[in-house]
Regions:
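Catalytic-site signature of metal-activated, phosphate-bearing donor transferases
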Residues: 2-164
Length: 165
């Protein structure tokens, strides 16, 4: 957390105008800030009154639901979630398994387009439309591993339906 964000949080808590506050995250990957790839607009609620907010039941990427007014803090939160490539891919593997379980619990069955179209679309969307290409090699790595994670999600879902480990 930066000094500026810390000061803003302290100031906000002295006279809160909302029950929850979004913080824009500054995404870093493999030692460099990612400015595109669809990750530049990442914001999450990180400051909230627990009496008016609750997380949903998602197994991964839980969402905090605020029952009241929200606002956004001005300062950004540096986000260093993936310190190494291996750390990033390990997290993608865990998330793909959890997302597959969520789909399985909803009764969604994998179809051919899940294996072919969805990963391809994820890569094209993240690398070209969300300008990951402007993040250089890191943008390519993020788009490629993200697309593979989508593919792996549906392989995991297919395995769940067949009771294969």
């Amino acid at each position: 957390i930066t000094k500026q964000l810390s000061q803003e949080i302290i100031s906000t808590l002295k006279d809160p105008k909302a029950i929850a506050y979004y913080v824009n995250r500054e995404f870093h990957f493999m030692g460099k800030q990612i400015k595109f790839s669809g990750l530049q607009n990442d914001n999450v609620i990180r400051l909230f009154n627990k009496n008016y907010c609750a997380y949903n039941d998602n197994l991964v990427h839980e969402v905090l639901k605020a029952n009241g007014k929200t606002a956004t803090l001005k300062n950004k939160l540096p986000h260093y979630t993936y310190t190494t490539f291996d750390n990033y891919t390990a997290k993608m593997h865990r998330y793909s398994a959890l997302k597959a379980k969520m789909l399985y619990n909803k009764g969604i069955k994998p179809k051919g387009y899940h294996f072919f179209f969805r990963p391809w679309y994820r890569f094209i969307n993240q690398y070209f439309f969300k300008l990951g290409i402007l993040d250089g090699k890191r943008g390519f790595i993020l788009a490629y591993t993200s697309a593979f994670s989508v593919f792996k999600r549906y392989v995991n879902l297919w395995l769940l339906y067949r009771n294969i480990k």
